[in-house]
A protein has these predicted regions:
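N-terminal first-folded block
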Residues: 1-40
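Short secondary-structure boundary segments
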Residues: 7, 63-64, 84-85
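Compact, glycine-rich, soluble single-domain proteins
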Residues: 34-54
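Short Gly/Pro-enriched loop/turn and capping motifs at secondary-structure junctions
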Residues: 43, 65-67
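Short active-site oxyanion
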Residues: 56-60, 78-80
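C-terminal structural segments of small proteins and small subunits
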Residues: 67-112
Length: 113
């Protein structure tokens, strides 16, 4: 599993399409094994969704996201947890622990974490 978070100086970037950097979390056995920062190749929701798919992202944690971006992520098979703010590392840890509070999610279940 690979989690992506729009990243801004340790916190989740407020708007998905405003992000300059994504923090990626590679997960093995429900634990973060590796993280890295990657710079997207564009700003539109379709470009960002395709970029994340190219990075083999399976799950996105973010704050604000448009319905069009939600559709683009769904088209690429990327699960979405939206309405999350604060520390990127803390939200990723909460997702893995099953305690993440998102205002919107496309996740069907968490059995594959």
């Amino acid at each position: 599993m690979r989690i992506a978070v729009p990243y801004d100086n340790g916190t989740i970037c407020a708007k998905f399409t405003d992000t300059e950097v994504f923090k990626l979390y590679d997960v093995v056995n429900k634990k973060v094994a590796f993280t890295q920062l990657v710079h997207p190749t564009g700003k539109s929701h379709n470009v960002l969704a395709g970029f994340l798919a190219d990075q083999l992202v399976t799950c996105l944690i973010c704050d604000e996201i448009s319905p069009e971006a939600q559709t683009a992520l769904d088209d690429w098979g990327i699960q979405l947890y939206a309405g999350c703010a604060g520390s990127a590392d803390d939200r990723a840890a909460e997702l893995l622990a099953g305690t993440l509070h998102a205002s919107f999610s496309t996740a069907r279940s968490s059995h594959h974490l």
